[in-house]
Amino acid sequence: GKNEGVTFIGTNNKNGAELAANFICDKTPKGADVAILTGMESQSTALLRRDGAIKGLKACGLNIVATQTAEWDTAKARSVTESILVKNPNIKAIFGSNDNMALGAIQALEDAGMNDVVVVGFDATPDAATSILAGKLTATIAQFSYNMGAYGVKYALALANGEKIDANIDTGTQLVTTKNANDFK
């Protein structure tokens, strides 16, 4: 719900997922089959990332054949991806709403001998950065926890000084690929 007078300072998860989707669109032929692994459906972060991915993937003409929860978990993502691959053997890309799920998807793809599928995660964990540099994970989306703290202090001081601040303050996201993955190890 809406809380009057409360400000959210953090990642715009929908925009971050759209950034991931746009990258997938650039790397995947129009009309190709793609899948989305979501977090827990009861959590706003999962829903926002799912919705952002759907918006971005549909906008460029990709065919979303599966949108399934793996509850942020690597082992569940591996199992869910295995099931998706049985029904959709021509899958060309997978968006994992966090890096754990993206890495689980990679395990399932490797088991199936499919190493040409674009896989993008979210969070830019050190394991994800290592996987990108190893040529497995294609990309991930970074969010900036430092900004969350710094902006929190900045805007708390602004409020204390009687200033008005926005209800939502985005702390930023960034695409992480082989070009910048070393910065996130």
Regions found by a protein language model. Name each.
Residues 1-185:
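A residue-level marker of the well-folded mature domains of exported/periplasmic proteins
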